[in-house]
Amino acid sequence: MEKKKILVVDDEVDLVKTIKFSLELEGYKVLVSYNGEDALNQARKENPDLILLDIMLPKLDGYKVCRLLKFDEQYKHIPILMMTAKTQEKDKLMGKETGANEYITKPFDMEELMEKVKTYLNK
């Protein structure tokens, strides 16, 4: 069986390494990106099974990346879990409006993140 592919997008290198390590331990293939423009290109090229997406990114913010993917017939099926330090209700609402499936606030518990990933990939 082919490994499920997850794209992790965040400009915090250490966080990306930690998430990547945890996901690989669970048996997932992990792609990484540190800016929105690259994330969009990778998502279109690799067609991942799930995207973990930060909001505050260089080049193209997470809201725009999410919106561009969710309003494209070819990619709208990909679950997107937004990860962010933004905790206000208006930020969560904006995340939902762009089509994000889930909104996870930082700092988050890695076990909780892994459970959310499993939930979306087993649907």
Language-model segments: residues:
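Short hydrophobic/Thr-rich beta-strand motif most characteristic of the beta2 strand and flanking loop
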Residues: G27-Y34, Q42
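Active-site beta3 strand of CheY-like receiver
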Residues: E46-L52, L57
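Charged docking surfaces used in two-component/phosphorelay signaling
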Residues: K17-L25
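The feature encodes the CheY-like receiver
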Residues: V16, P58, K76, Q88
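C-terminal output helix
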Residues: F108-V117
